[in-house]
Amino acid sequence: SYINVLREANQIAGTYSTDEALFSSPEAYKAHLNGQYIDWADELLQTGVTQNYSLSVSGGTEKTKAYFSLNFSDEQGQFTGDDYKVYSTNMRIDHEIKKWLSVGVNMQGSYVYRNKAYSRFINSLVSVPLGTVYNEDGSINVTPVPGDGNTINLLLNQDKSVYRDNNQNFKLFLNPYIEIRPFKGMTIQSRLNASLGYDKKNYFQGIGSYQYYASDGPNASGTSASVYAQIDQNRSYNYKWENIFTYNFNIKKVTSWNHNQTDKSWQKQDNIKNNSYLWHNMDGTGIVYSNYTMSKGLGLVGRINYSYLGKYLFSASVRQDGSSRLAK
């Protein structure tokens, strides 16, 4: 038990005198005598539940083939307030317009929304397990042991009006192609690999959060530097365009062009006076940061294979690449 651990530790250190002296305050000792103990791990943890749903359809004709799927995943984590949702889709269409002409496209998209709990599980192992978690009216005790400010209630951040940490992520991949077969043995394929990405993180710790009382004391009131909101945004756009010329699998030429760009922004503001706005009402007094990167590249590849008498294979290739990242 907790009291036995305290006794043993103090006896080993040679500092044990009385049970009451083991506690940080008379109020904490009183809570022990009244049997007011808290299992912090049990209060923070919950049974995790995962749900997965999927729907797919496929079909086609002699010249057309298609596939479509929808997927949804909902995960409730082991910490109260931790959840993770994923929506995704996949679509593919291939169509032969003429015997010498085919087109197609493959598209994949996903949207992820996650709420992250303030899951400092280590705190549940080292926090004093004394007192009561809730007041008689059902509200959360800031200090589980009244009058003893040495322990702050670990459940404060389960209130979404004082603490939020969520992420949103969107990704789209698009891969169209066209294939031309002008004469026997000759194939020309042009394909595009494009992707869009958007990631946003919203964070808020307000008046009444665990960090607020841990930083400013259990009797804190009003705003302070520990009350702040933060937004991180990342946008990316990339594509690669390839043209592949093949003749009898012996001669191949590839041209490749790629473009990559990323736009990042970050904003933070502290001393927020009203929890109601969360991160939605920042003014010009906060910290703002932005960054933009872009690069382009071009590649040329040629390859010739020649087989003689079915015994000897001769191969020659050449490649040349250029990138804006290498520019002086």
Map each language-model feature to its residues:
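Outer-membrane beta-barrel channels and translocator barrels
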Residues: T50, T61-E62, K98, R181-F183, ...
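Outer-membrane beta-barrel initiation region
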Residues: E43-T47, V57-T61
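Repeated loop/turn-to-beta-strand initiation elements of outer-membrane beta-barrel proteins
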Residues: K63-A66, W100-V103, G185-I188, K311-F314
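Solvent-exposed loop/turn segments connecting transmembrane beta-strands
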Residues: Q78-G81, S324-K328
